[in-house]
Amino acid sequence: MVTVNRLVLSGTVCKTPIRKVSPSGIPHCQFVLEHRSTQEEAGLSRQAWCRMPVIVSGLSSQAVTHSITVGTQLTVHGFISCHQGRNGLSKIVLHAEQIELIDSGD
């Protein structure tokens, strides 16, 4: 059985990051990444758009999360998983394993 679960998504942080520490002492940073691009499908151009919740966990990743604010442009590498909210609804979340800040050229 093939079990590949990899996602790379670039975009702009569109919601203020929430930083928490779990009861076991693991730091977590949660934010939403908005992606917009033009993709080719069946020989035609189409607009692609999504908002993806992102979770960054662990001490080694927290240094980069301190510079993340609304408007920061990022490329996130990681895996996706389903999380169930308090309301019982499930959503797909990107668990970041690597984050690259995109230089806006300002």
Curated annotation (Swiss-Prot):
Q: Which UniProt keywords apply?
A: DNA replication, DNA-binding, Primosome
The UniProt record lists the SSB domain at 4-103
State the superkingdom. Answer: Bacteria
Q: Which InterPro entries match?
A: NA-bd_OB-fold, Primosome_PriB/ssb, Prisomal_replication_PriB
Q: Which biological process terms from the Gene Ontology are attached to this UniProt entry?
A: DNA replication, synthesis of primer
For this UniProt entry, what's an example GO CC term?
primosome complex
Q: Name one GO molecular function term.
A: single-stranded DNA binding
Q: Which family does it belong to?
A: Belongs to the PriB family.
Q: What does this protein do?
A: Involved in the restart of stalled replication forks, which reloads the replicative helicase on sites other than the origin of replication; the PriA-PriB pathway is the major replication restart pathway. During primosome assembly it facilitates complex formation between PriA and DnaT on DNA; stabilizes PriA on DNA. Stimulates the DNA unwinding activity of PriA helicase.
- Complex formation: Homodimer. Interacts with PriA and DnaT. Component of the replication restart primosome. Primosome assembly occurs via a 'hand-off' mechanism. PriA binds to replication forks, subsequently PriB then DnaT bind; DnaT then displaces ssDNA to generate the helicase loading substrate.
- Record protein name field: Replication restart protein PriB
